[in-house]
């Protein structure tokens, strides 16, 4: 019982502590690629979290302002639960493919809900809605900045992130089981299906974290911060924490699913191995971001289809046991 409590609290807490360094590492790598010095490693993540905590809080002009502000906390809880179930692989209610997909879908839905609630500009109530699309003509849809970001988030949920969920499914297909305990200790990556699945997973990872080139939900050119624009002060700190935690949580999930290395509190070396592998993903994503423009949906859809095709090939190989 004590070990389970330590796993539920300790593993996600350690992941969060490590994740605060990831934005700084990413910015440093990107700066070096662009022949700049860049900020200190602690500034973009660790110190930014505390900086936002001491900013002045403003209530957004939203239908449900309290719900809007607290939704990033829901995202943190979801990711905390995801890290917990990968360390407690015998917890059947959630430690399975259905639980993993369900939790991550909740995290994605946060952006759709956020964009449906707020109608202000940087915390200031406007005499008119910040309409960025549409006309006053009858039967013409009019959208605010946040609403347009929410529509884009919904498109990313339905089509963009599909390769990621397909990739999480492949290790379970080969084992003919949906439970995590059946794939832990089995390096699925070192198989033909695992190679295709890993390629599909990485493309899905970059889409899931909503970074360049898949940052259309909050591109600065039109919707600015999109659904999350009105998160201010301590609520912005919560959002920053959820973004950082997502970076390492999805990498940790790969280590568990594809290499069979679950962070076990009774075997500390597995925690080191799991998080070391998890850190590789945001670093690789940084190289993609440094050389990529923001893609439109007419470019995102083909990439998603190609990644899905790669995943389907891996799915066939997994069925064959290759």
Swiss-Prot record:
Alphabetical keyword list: Cell membrane, Membrane, Transmembrane, Transmembrane helix
Record's protein name: Uncharacterized protein MJ1362
Compartment(s) where it occurs, according to its Swiss-Prot or TrEMBL record: Cell membrane
GO cellular component, one term: plasma membrane
Membrane topology: Multi-pass membrane protein
Residues passing through the membrane, by range: 5-25, 37-57, 71-91, 109-129, 153-173, 189-209, 245-265, 268-288, 300-320
Upper lineage: Archaea, Methanobacteriati, Methanobacteriota, Methanomada group, Methanococci
UniProt KW Nuclease keyword: no
Pfam family, one: NADHdh
GO biological process, one term: anaerobic electron transport chain
Organism: Methanocaldococcus jannaschii (strain ATCC 43067 / DSM 2661 / JAL-1 / JCM 10045 / NBRC 100440) (Methanococcus jannaschii)
């Amino acid at each position: 019982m004590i070990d389970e409590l330590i796993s539920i609290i300790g593993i996600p807490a350690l992941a969060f502590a490590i994740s605060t360094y990831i934005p700084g590492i990413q910015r440093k790598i990107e700066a070096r690629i662009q022949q700049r010095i860049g900020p200190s490693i602690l500034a973009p993540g660790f110190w930014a979290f505390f900086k936002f905590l001491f900013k002045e809080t403003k209530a957004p002009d939203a239908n449900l302002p309290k719900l809007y502000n607290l939704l990033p906390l829901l995202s943190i809880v979801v990711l905390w639960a995801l890290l917990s179930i990968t360390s407690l692989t015998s917890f059947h209610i959630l430690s399975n493919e259905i639980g993993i997909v369900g939790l991550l879908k909740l995290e994605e839905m946060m952006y759709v809900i956020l964009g449906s609630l707020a109608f202000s500009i940087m915390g200031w109530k406007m005499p008119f809605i910040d309409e960025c699309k549409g006309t006053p003509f009858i039967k013409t849809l009019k959208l605010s900045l946040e609403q347009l970001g929410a529509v884009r988030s919904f498109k990313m949920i339905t089509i963009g992130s599909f390769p990621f969920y397909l990739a999480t499914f492949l290790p379970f297909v080969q084992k003919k089981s949906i439970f995590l305990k059946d794939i832990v200790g089995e390096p699925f990556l070192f198989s033909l299906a695992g190679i295709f699945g890993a390629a599909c997973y990485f493309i899905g990872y970059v889409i899931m974290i909503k970074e360049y080139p898949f940052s259309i939900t909050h591109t600065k050119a039109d919707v600015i911060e999109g659904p999350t624009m009105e998160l201010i002060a301590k609520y912005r700190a919560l959002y920053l924490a959820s973004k950082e935690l997502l970076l390492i949580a999805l990498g940790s999930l790969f280590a568990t699913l594809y290499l069979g290395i679950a962070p076990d509190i009774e075997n500390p070396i597995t925690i080191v191995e799991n998080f070391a592998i998890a850190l590789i993903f945001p670093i690789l994503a940084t190289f993609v971001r440094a050389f990529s423009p923001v893609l439109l949906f007419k470019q995102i859809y083909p990439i998603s289809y190609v990644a899905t095709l790669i995943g389907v090939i891996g799915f066939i190989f997994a069925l064959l046991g290759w």
